[in-house]
């Protein structure tokens, strides 16, 4: 995060200086740090250190993505739309005021083709062979009041692509087949009614063959004018008058029959005189409407010198200001570039989509004014609080809290059947024994109470303590048998086994919720593998052996796979060697693990050596 210090700390909140409408949800991001207590308010240096923690993670992910990208950046929808909006829309029309001499002549219909030369080898008396991809038809002047077919519109690549590739000879070709027979013809395309503007039927192309007048507008001529024009970048329409020499020629019919190609021959043309045709070419970006809607593009360049206007406009278009809250730091990126991973996002909306989805450890406030495209970046409160606690408290001195499950006390209580009332006869030995036991118990209780009274200086009477003790004892003895009786009446089953539980298992402290029954798990695994149709019996068997092994050995992480393969080879080595198909299935499975980077070649070699050792031990009679 190469930050630039601001001259004023209030400049971090630059969004408040402009008349930019922002909702209350956006404004609350500016005061997110205010939710911390006074002892948690950090100085700018400490805040900057907290910002660097997530950035280290993002830098690590970015370096990993260089060699193994998670996805193609150019396939993102917002980048595709941004690229489409940067394409140039070219409109070609014929102004009647500049072609007064031609209005009396019949130059219509006039075909406009967007073509590219297929070969640069010149042939005497012939033009290069062109292959056209787009075709339009003009039937009138644009100021004649007849708007039907008065303009020909094309969409070409963006200006940067045209300049970088030098357009490879892209050309607009104008072909006039005007005759008295075709005078007044309107509403017809190049292919007439048989085909659309984008699709050309080969049979209809043959109608173009014959004598004609043709001229061309090289795309390089437009590049030279558009490259030095700042209005195109600002979303305005750029108009350029161009004079074209319409030369007589003969359109070869043989080329029209091969993949939308055409060539002109000057030898077969009659002694016709060429003429000059005045054409108006208008250029604008395809997304010009969206550009003009943005308040950032309504900035006035009246104070900028004309010599520096184009340079300043280009530098300003994709600049985004990032304000890092409470750090007194900010930075500016070009071409709508993310400051964390340096990904070009195409436009401001694409930058918003990228940062909110790829860098969610921060809060963002996106806003646009006449002077700035800005993003206020704030560290999330939860992350900041975690880092604050981790910085202040040493892990070795932190108190570790552990709360165990409530453990039932084991009390030896007579069964419910013995707790029933028992009637004794008066004067019987049983009654005498019971009375003597009660007297001994009462004497012990009185002795305990007297001792406690002496120790604590209590003045409470013995009857109060006796009443309290007897009430607790009676309630405990009365409640527990009832609970046991209720537990005995109901039938409980294991959650996984679906088997009935014994009464001792119900009263025990062991929880059967997380237990896994191996027999049931093996049965379910076999049922799942039986549903596979394109798998052999031995492959199903090796899959079942592996699934059962990793379940019993608790193989949970990818790092466990190497030693699990070695242990599997030792455990099932005898069984694998007895069945060659099973052995090859195990080796193919290890190759699949190697393809997924879960197993190294060294571990595969170790597993094969383990199997070889087991095989040698079986074949060696001395070791047996």
Curated annotation (Swiss-Prot):
Coiled coil: none annotated. Residues 420-445 are annotated as: Disordered. Widely expressed. Highly expressed in shoot apical meristem and inflorescence meristem. Expressed in roots, leaves and immature seeds. Pfam families: DUF7651, VEFS-Box, Zn_SUZ12. GO terms for molecular function: chromatin DNA binding; zinc ion binding. CDD domains: VEFS-box_EMF2-like, ZnB-Zn_EMF2-like. Residues 432-445 have a biased composition (Acidic residues). GO terms for biological process: cell differentiation; chromatin organization. Keywords: Chromatin regulator, Developmental protein, Differentiation, Metal-binding, Transcription, Transcription regulation, Zinc, Zinc-finger. Residues 474-609 are annotated as: VEFS-box. GO terms for cellular component: nucleus. InterPro entries: EMF2-like_DUF7651, Polycomb_protein_VEFS-Box. A zinc finger (C2H2-type) spans 338-359. Component of the polycomb repressive complex 2 (PRC2), which methylates 'Lys-27' residues of histone H3 (H3K27me3), leading to transcriptional repression of the affected target gene. Polycomb group (PcG) protein. PcG proteins act by forming multiprotein complexes, which are required to maintain the transcriptionally repressive state of homeotic genes throughout development. PcG proteins are not required to initiate repression, but to maintain it during later stages of development. They act via the methylation of histones, rendering chromatin heritably changed in its expressibility. Belongs to the VEFS (VRN2-EMF2-FIS2-SU(Z)12) family. This is Polycomb group protein EMF2A. The lineage of its organism: Eukaryota, Viridiplantae, Streptophyta, Embryophyta, Tracheophyta.
């Amino acid at each position: 995060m190469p930050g630039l210090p601001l001259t004023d700390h209030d400049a971090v909140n630059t969004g408040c200086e402009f008349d930019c409408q922002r909702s209350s949800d956006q404004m609350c991001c500016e005061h997110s740090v205010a939710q911390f207590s006074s002892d948690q308010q950090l100085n700018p240096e400490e805040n900057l250190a907290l910002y660097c923690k997530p950035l280290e993670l993002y830098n690590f992910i970015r370096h990993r993505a260089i060699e193994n990208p998670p996805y193609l950046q150019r396939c993102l929808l917002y980048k595709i739309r941004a690229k489409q909006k940067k394409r140039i829309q070219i409109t070609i029309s014929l102004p009647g005021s500049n072609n007064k001499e031609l209005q009396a002549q019949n130059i219509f219909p006039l075909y406009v083709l967007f073509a590219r030369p297929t070969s640069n080898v010149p042939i005497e008396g012939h033009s290069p062979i062109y292959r056209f991809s787009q075709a339009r038809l003009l039937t009138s002047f644009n100021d004649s009041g007849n708007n039907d077919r008065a303009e020909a519109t094309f969409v070409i690549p963006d200006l940067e692509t045209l300049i970088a590739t030098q357009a490879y000879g892209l050309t607009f070709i104008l072909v006039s087949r005007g005759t008295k027979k075709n005078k007044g013809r309107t509403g017809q395309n190049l292919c007439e009614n048989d085909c659309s503007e984008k699709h050309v039927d080969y049979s209809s192309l043959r109608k173009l063959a014959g004598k004609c007048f043709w001229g061309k507008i090289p795309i390089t001529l437009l590049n030279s004018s558009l490259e030095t024009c700042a209005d195109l970048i600002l979303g305005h329409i750029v108009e350029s008058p161009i004079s074209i020499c319409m030369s007589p020629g003969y359109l070869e019919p043989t080329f029209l029959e091969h993949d939308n190609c055409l060539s002109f021959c000057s030898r077969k043309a009659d002694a016709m005189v060429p003429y000059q045709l005045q054409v108006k070419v208008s250029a604008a970006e395809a997304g010009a409407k969206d550009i003009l809607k943005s308040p950032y593009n309504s900035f006035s360049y009246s104070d900028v010198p004309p010599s520096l206007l184009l340079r300043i406009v280009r530098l300003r278009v994709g600049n985004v200001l990032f304000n890092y809250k409470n750090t007194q730091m900010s930075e500016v990126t070009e071409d709508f570039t993310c400051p964390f991973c340096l990904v070009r996002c195409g436009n401001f909306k694409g930058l918003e989509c990228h940062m909110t989805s790829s860098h969610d450890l921060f809060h963002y406030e996106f806003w646009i004014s006449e002077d700035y495209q800005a993003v206020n970046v704030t560290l999330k409160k939860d992350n900041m609080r975690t880092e604050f606690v981790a910085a202040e408290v040493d892990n070795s001195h932190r108190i570790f809290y552990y709360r165990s499950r409530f453990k039932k006390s084991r009390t030896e209580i007579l069964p419910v059947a013995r707790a029933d009332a028992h009637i004794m006869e008066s004067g019987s030995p049983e009654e005498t024994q019971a009375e003597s036991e009660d007297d001994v118990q009462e004497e012990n209780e009185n002795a305990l109470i007297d001792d406690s009274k002496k120790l604590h200086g209590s003045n409470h009477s013995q009857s109060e303590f006796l009443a309290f003790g007897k009430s607790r004892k009676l309630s405990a003895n009365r409640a527990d048998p009832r609970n046991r009786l209720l537990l005995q009446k109901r039938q409980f089953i294991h959650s996984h086994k679906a088997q009935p539980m014994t009464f001792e298992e119900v009263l025990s402290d062991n929880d059967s919720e997380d237990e896994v029954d191996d027999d049931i798990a093996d049965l379910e695994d076999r049922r799942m593998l039986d549903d596979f149709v394109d798998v052999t019996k031995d492959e199903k068997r090796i899959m079942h052996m592996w699934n059962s092994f990793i379940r019993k050995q608790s193989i949970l992480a990818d790092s466990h796979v190497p030693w699990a393969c070695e242990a599997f080879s030792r455990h099932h080595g005898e069984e694998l060697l007895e069945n060659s198909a099973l052995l090859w299935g195990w080796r193919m499975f290890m190759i699949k693990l190697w393809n997924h980077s879960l197993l190294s070649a060294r571990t595969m070699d170790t597993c094969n050596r383990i199997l070889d050792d087991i095989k040698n031990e079986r074949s060696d009679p001395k070791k047996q």
